[in-house]
Amino acid sequence: MTAMPSFAVVTDGGLDAYPTLLNDVPVAPFSVAFGERSYPMNEVSRQWLYDELGRNPAHPTSSQPSPQQWLDAYAAVPSGTDILAVTISSGLSGSRNAAAQARDLAGRQVTLHDSMTLSAAQAFQVHAANVAAQRGESMETAIAWMNAVQAETELQFTIETLEYLRRGGRIGTVAAALGGLLNLKPVVMVDKKTGTYVNAGRARSYRGGIEAVTSQVTRKYGEGTPLRVGLLYGTHPEDADQALEQLAARHPIVWSDRTGVNPVLSVHVGPRALGVAAAPGAWPWER
């Protein structure tokens, strides 16, 4: 007999959801803007963004969910149900602050949890929270599981060009020019303590960047360690296939899935990117 859910989970647009995880929850969307026009991410597709990047001279910007958008996400939860709001890292966005403002206005019992990460790694935590809710576990147990998932999950990515990081002000003009001249591809990870991007290495080619990402996963967990792997791709799904093939040659893969990078995150990494969220073996509740 399945327990009644003990609370409901909501999240924000930092999430890259996987169909084989419990990621189908109300979302407070980020927005993408080209010049004066702003579009909530739930109203545009990845392909639309890639088309705009190719034809629109304006560089897009992204913006966090507003308190009203968080209120709308809370309102999607049936009245009387407590809410666990899982946010993108506060080191990367002010979404958590907007969620807190909305909580003060909602008249609901809302608990905030800073994932200290984003994207596929955020999806792992949302899944953990939903498993706890569906099993009738307490919110404290859900948070403990999310903290365990956060501690053991590594999120890394590489990109084909530094141009979009440069345009967005996340890398200097000189660094971008030098990287382009030498064809250097960064390997970026999310620091667990600060929840911010840190440089984890570089490669001389995009294919080399993919190999660098998967090699760092193996160095982290040790060859032969069973892994759960969430893969991310931009315009080329085959990049995810290549990364999985490399990891599967060195690890038993106990779960894997792939999904496209959402439009808002694509603003910063550009059309072609590869990301990997990896964690060892079983989920916390399976041990």
Swiss-Prot record:
Chain positions recorded as hexadecanoate binding sites: 62, 93
PANTHER family, per the entry: DEGV DOMAIN-CONTAINING PROTEIN DR_1986-RELATED, FATTY ACID-BINDING PROTEIN TM_1468
Domain DegV, chain residue ranges per copy: 7-280
Role according to the record: May bind long-chain fatty acids, such as palmitate, and may play a role in lipid transport or fatty acid metabolism.
Disulfide-bonded cysteines: none
GO molecular function list: lipid binding
Coiled-coil region: none
Pfam families: DegV
InterPro entries given in the database record: DegV, DegV_C, DegV_domain_contain
Alphabetical UniProt keywords: Lipid-binding
Stated name of the protein: DegV domain-containing protein DR_0500
